[in-house]
């Protein structure tokens, strides 16, 4: 003990002091209680013990700074906090103030400890690179470059102002690995530090420490040291498990985004720059209030949103603020990117609700459509949902002023004479003076547009497998309800390829009188959209009834217009022969590819009689079909 005391020059005449009886107000710079020739100072604000050498330190005096040598024999000057007598008395008398003071000191401790760790990392970077680099970084250009006045050519440690934060000297800056060769880096297979694999090899690194190397071709991230910018993109200085610090490399975010060390890195820096990040976020949120929800962003960007990108940008901005950097170009670029990320983040909340609403509508729709093939709903264009006032139905709703059709009293007897109904038998179409509608082998329509379809009914001798029973079995093709990109709203496309003459679906809605349809049509024309379909197959007189699919309907509600359509509308009678109340059904006019949008001509301009369609000329509506023969005006 005596030897140790002699070595450090302890005054053996010092007596243990009773601090409770110590009158702080009477202490002076020359008081023996506060003076030591060889001082050991516990500098709590930088997180380590500094040993003063040949330095007289006065803990309570007019001295404002202390100069000492650190463990690397570098001169360090630390500014001491000078407490007033009033504050000292308050701390001694108030336990609450002492606790608040200690909390503040601990916060400073965490902040400066992080800065010290970065400073240590920078010193390691000044060591010469080893010749045995990992295989994936053999092409890295490690030539050092002199600091340039151009911010884009700076090494990563300077682009965010680390030089001013860590107090490094100018000659240290020149030795930091440059990012000039970053573009040549090959992507590593990064993985998280975990249990050693059976194939791990043991080797000595340059420090003489035994380290376990991962299998050949794999490199494990041991630690992410810092983040900087290269051409306005974040890059990370990575320490690899089993390799010396001199073999650290700069990696892009894509290379290390999925590593667990990235989560630790982000969490650590968010705590370090908590105050700066909070202030920056508040500033960006004020700018965000003035931006429309989806201005200059796409649904694809919303779906691909990653919170990590925003977190990294906020950390980069905080580093610039903390360093007092005068650079404007880089923070501006990062700020614009962070603002867009926050805009996308805001839209993502709306997107989640939208997808939930669309999924619910899809579920209800397919429940109504059973047992028909499912219909998929998707919107990759905007954040719109299906109108909540629209009710999906399976069969037509008969209005109060519309008479209910009476059941037919006539049915064919084809199976009594032959095995099945064919074009050569006296089937239902023959009774109405029309042609047999379908080909027997393919079940495809064999009629031209404008013809009528008469199917077998419940009074016919044939069963449900009859080739003249197609529409009554319902939709048999899968479809997709999607949002169009040309401003036409929702549309319908084929999920699979369709042949010419295939039945697609029936036009379903409310069957109302023509007088009521005229009243509703005025409101629809004002909105530039109509769902009124006149049941006027009998052209000898005006139509008596109209189908309105605006508020009640099925998938046909969403089929758009085209001047060159791939669908045609046919009138069809099944259980009754009331000419004024046919079913309106859609058949394909030509082969349709999978994914092709389905459309029909709302206004048959090639036919002056204009059968089945409701014409409205009150408002001119632009046609957006984009076909070569487009009439430019819909109605």
Curated annotation (Swiss-Prot):
Zn(2+) 2 binds at residues 412, 428, 456, 460. Zn(2+) 3 binds at residues 421, 456, 462, 466. Residues 81-188 are annotated as: Binds to Su(var)205 and Suvar(3)7. Residues 128-139, 147-161 have a biased composition (Low complexity). Residues 477-603 form the SET domain. Keywords: Centromere, Chromatin regulator, Chromosome, Metal-binding, Methyltransferase, Nucleus, Repressor, S-adenosyl-L-methionine, Transcription, Transcription regulation, Transferase, Zinc. One of its GO terms (molecular function) is histone H3K9 methyltransferase activity. Signal peptide: none annotated. Its EC number is 2.1.1.355. Zn(2+) 1 binds at residues 412, 414, 421, 427-428. Residues 410-474 form the Pre-SET domain. Although the SET domain contains the active site of enzymatic activity, both pre-SET and post-SET domains are required for methyltransferase activity. The SET domain also participates in stable binding to heterochromatin. In the pre-SET domain, Cys residues bind 3 zinc ions that are arranged in a triangular cluster; some of these Cys residues contribute to the binding of two zinc ions within the cluster. Histone methyltransferase that specifically trimethylates 'Lys-9' of histone H3 using monomethylated H3 'Lys-9' as substrate. H3 'Lys-9' trimethylation represents a specific tag for epigenetic transcriptional repression by recruiting Su(var)205/HP1 to methylated histones. Mainly functions in heterochromatin regions, thereby playing a central role in the establishment of constitutive heterochromatin at pericentric regions. Involved in heterochromatic gene silencing including the modification of position-effect-variegation. This is Histone-lysine N-methyltransferase Su(var)3-9. It comes from Drosophila melanogaster (Fruit fly).
């Amino acid at each position: 003990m005596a030897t140790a005391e002699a070595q450090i020059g302890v005054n053996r005449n010092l007596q243990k002091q009773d601090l409770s009886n110590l009158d702080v107000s009477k202490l002076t710079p020359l008081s023996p209680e506060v003076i030591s020739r060889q001082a050991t100072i516990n500098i709590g604000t930088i997180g380590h013990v500094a040993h003063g050498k040949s330095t007289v330190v006065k803990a309570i005096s007019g001295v404002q700074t202390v100069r000492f040598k650190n463990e690397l024999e570098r001169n360090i000057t630390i500014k001491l906090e000078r407490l007033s007598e009033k504050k000292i008395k308050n701390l001694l008398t108030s336990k609450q103030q002492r606790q608040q003071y200690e909390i503040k000191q601990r916060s400073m401790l965490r902040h400066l400890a992080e800065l010290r760790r970065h400073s240590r990392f920078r010193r390691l970077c000044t060591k010469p690179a080893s010749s045995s680099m990992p295989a994936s970084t053999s092409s890295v250009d490690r030539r050092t470059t002199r600091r340039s006045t151009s911010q884009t050519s700076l090494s990563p440690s300077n682009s965010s102002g680390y030089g001013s934060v860590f107090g490094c000297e100018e000659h240290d800056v020149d030795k930091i690995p440059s990012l000039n060769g970053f573009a040549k880096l090959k992507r590593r297979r990064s993985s998280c530090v975990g249990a050693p694999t059976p194939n791990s090899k043991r080797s000595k690194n340059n420090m003489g420490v035994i380290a376990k190397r991962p299998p050949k071709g794999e490199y494990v991230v041991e630690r992410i040291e810092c983040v900087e910018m290269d051409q306005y993109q974040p890059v990370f200085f990575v320490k690899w498990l089993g390799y010396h610090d001199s073999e650290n490399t700069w990696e892009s975010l894509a290379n290390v985004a999925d590593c667990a060390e990235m989560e630790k890195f982000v969490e650590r820096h968010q705590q370090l720059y908590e105050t700066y990040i909070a202030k920056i976020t508040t500033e960006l949120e004020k700018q965000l209030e003035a931006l429309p929800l989806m201005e200059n962003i796409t649904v694809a960007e919303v779906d691909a949103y990653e919170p990590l990108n925003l977190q990294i940008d906020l950390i980069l901005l905080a580093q610039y603020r903390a360093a007092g950097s005068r650079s404007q170009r880089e923070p501006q670029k990062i700020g614009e990117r962070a603002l867009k990320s926050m805009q996308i983040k805001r839209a993502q909340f709306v997107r989640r609700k939208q997808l939930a609403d669309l999924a619910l509508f899809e579920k209800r729709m397919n429940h109504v459509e059973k047992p028909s093939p499912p219909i998929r709903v998707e919107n990759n264009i905007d954040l719109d949902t299906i109108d909540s006032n629209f009710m999906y139905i399976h069969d037509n709703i008969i209005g109060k002023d519309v008479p209910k059709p009476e059941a037919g009293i006539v049915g064919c007897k084809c199976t009594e004479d032959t095995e099945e109904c064919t074009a050569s038998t006296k089937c239902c179409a023959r009774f109405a003076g029309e042609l047999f509608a379908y080909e027997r082998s393919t079940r495809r329509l064999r009629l031209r547009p404008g013809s009528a379809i008469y199917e077998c009914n419940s009074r016919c001798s044939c069963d449900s497998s009859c080739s003249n029973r197609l529409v009554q079995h319902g939709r048999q093709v899968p479809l997709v309800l999607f949002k169009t990109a040309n401003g036409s709203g929702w549309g319908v496309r084929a999920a699979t390829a369709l042949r010419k003459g295939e039945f697609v679906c029936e036009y379903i809605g409310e069957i109302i009188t023509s007088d009521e349809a005229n009243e509703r049509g005025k409101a629809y024309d004002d909105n530039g959209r109509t769902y009124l379909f006149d049941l006027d197959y009998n052209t000898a007189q005006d139509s008596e009834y109209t189908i309105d699919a605006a508020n009640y309907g099925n998938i046909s509600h969403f089929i758009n217009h085209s001047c060159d359509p791939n669908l045609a509308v046919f009138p069809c009678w099944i259980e009754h022969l009331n000419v004024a109340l046919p079913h309106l059904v859609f058949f394909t006019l030509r082969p349709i590819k999978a994914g092709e949008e389905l459309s029909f001509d709302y206004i048959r301009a090639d036919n002056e009689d204009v059968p089945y369609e409701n014409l409205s000329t009150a408002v001119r509506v632009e046609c957006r079909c984009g076909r070569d023969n487009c009439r430019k005006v819909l109605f």
